[in-house]
């Protein structure tokens, strides 16, 4: 394994795989904050060259956190399909990138190969891709999952309806649900971020969400994004269960900072299978985001792209219905501006798909970032072109509870019409019965929530 290269007469030497992975990243403020970013564009190019020549085995055998020290590393390594790995272990990262982008390689071919990849290998591929590569490669890797709706089918584009309220006011939540439904949002999930994380409040909000779902016989699933243990307790006490949610991190220390253990995720999957109102086999929902490990002091000197890929390796083990990166939510300390946020969103999407998970993206930014709503619109169109499974939707994209800017209900409608995409098939049939959609297009009734009153 070579850890050095020569460019224009200058020798660039790296100490280990972790450093090569970090220096090969495109510039982002979080890596600068962590002290792991490339010191120059030349060093970045040199790291990309060294990384391109490394083999899949080189990187698998050198995880950024040792196997003996971290439960996430152990889970990722133990989940590798050894038959697939043996086929590709001598490929260079450049070979793997070319394979993913090759026109003659099918989605099924990639679906087999990705079983043999660890998360560090997945991250390595993203690091040597251009933005167009990230889009083209992501498009080739559909990941389809089933709850009450089917997500990820080619030609579809789904939306999480996000009716957050600063007081968990159930009337406000219901009103936002009706507005979102009138635009065709909500086929991924109707998911509320609660202000108060306790069983009683969670049950009250879930009852509101399912009150709407049941009244209008909507083929979707609900979720209140409290801590996983709160959700489990509420469901055991009789609250209506849809998807069970948890934010995850790419290291054991990061999970502990989130108050999470793998045993909790195991229990959530078991509870969901027993109690939840899900027609399909996928009942979990995870959120992630570049920089989360560093913000928790749990990145172990690794860069934020690699740590994000490890989130997806962890998620893959649980076969969730939904995973999305909340790409700009963590702030400019980690992704400084629209250029860095767009790059991260495209990286996260292809890394999720190459990990075999149902990948969405919250195209978003915080109010102190060097970004604006045009960023969100640019990113959502790029991601929809790349085959992203879903984005978020809320009134005008302004989340007054979480205090950040995301995408609006009408943005999903715009993308669908612009690119000829449709909701999940079960949800589209329901929209047709309500007179909101016909022949894949919104009708004149769309956008008017009064049709539910």
Please report, for each region that a protein language model flagged, where it lies by residue.
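Anaerobic metallocofactor- and corrinoid-dependent redox/one-carbon enzyme cores
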Residues: 1-174, 182, 189-453
């Amino acid at each position: 394994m070579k850890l050095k290269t020569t460019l224009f007469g200058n020798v660039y030497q790296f100490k280990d795989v972790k450093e090569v992975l970090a220096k090969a990243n495109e510039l982002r403020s979080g890596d600068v904050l962590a002290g792991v970013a490339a010191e120059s564009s030349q060093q970045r190019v040199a790291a990309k060259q060294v990384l391109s020549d490394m083999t899949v085995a080189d990187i698998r055998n050198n995880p950024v956190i040792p196997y003996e020290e971290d439960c996430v590393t152990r889970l990722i390594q133990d989940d590798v399909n050894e038959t697939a790995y043996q086929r590709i272990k001598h490929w260079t990262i450049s070979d793997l990138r070319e394979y993913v982008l090759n026109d003659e390689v099918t989605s099924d071919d990639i679906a087999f190969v990705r079983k043999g990849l660890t998360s560090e290998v997945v991250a390595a591929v993203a690091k040597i891709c251009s933005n167009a590569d990230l889009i083209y490669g992501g498009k080739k890797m559909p990941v389809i999952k089933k709850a009450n709706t089917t997500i990820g089918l080619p030609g579809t584009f789904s939306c999480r309806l996000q009716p957050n309220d600063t007081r968990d006011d159930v009337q406000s939540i219901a009103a936002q649900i009706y507005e979102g439904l009138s635009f065709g949002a909500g086929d991924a999930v109707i998911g509320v971020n609660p202000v108060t994380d306790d069983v009683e409040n969670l049950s009250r909000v879930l009852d509101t969400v399912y009150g709407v779902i049941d009244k209008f016989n909507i083929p979707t699933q609900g979720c209140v994004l409290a801590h996983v243990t709160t959700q489990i307790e509420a469901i055991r006490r009789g609250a209506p269960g849809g998807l069970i949610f948890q934010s995850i991190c790419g290291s054991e220390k990061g999970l502990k900072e989130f108050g999470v253990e793998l045993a909790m995720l195991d229990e959530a999957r078991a509870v969901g299978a027993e109690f939840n109102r899900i027609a399909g086999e996928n009942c979990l929902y995870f959120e992630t985001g570049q920089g989360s490990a560093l913000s928790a002091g749990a990145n172990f000197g690794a860069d934020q792209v690699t740590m994000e890929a490890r989130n997806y390796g962890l998620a893959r083990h649980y076969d969730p219905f939904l995973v999305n990166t909340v790409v700009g939510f963590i702030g400019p300390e980690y992704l400084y501006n629209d250029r860095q946020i767009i790059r991260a969103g495209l990286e996260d999407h292809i890394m999720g798909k190459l990990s075999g998970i149902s990948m969405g993206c919250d195209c978003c930014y915080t109010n102190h970032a060097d970004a604006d709503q045009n960023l969100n619109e640019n990113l959502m169109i790029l991601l929809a072109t790349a085959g992203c499974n879903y984005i978020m939707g809320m009134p005008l994209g302004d989340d007054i509870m979480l205090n950040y800017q995301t995408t609006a209900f009408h943005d999903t409608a715009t993308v669908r019409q612009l690119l000829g995409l449709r909701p999940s098939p079960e949800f589209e049939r329901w929209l047709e019965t309500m007179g909101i959609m016909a022949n894949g297009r919104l009708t004149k009734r769309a956008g008017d929530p009064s049709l539910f009153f």
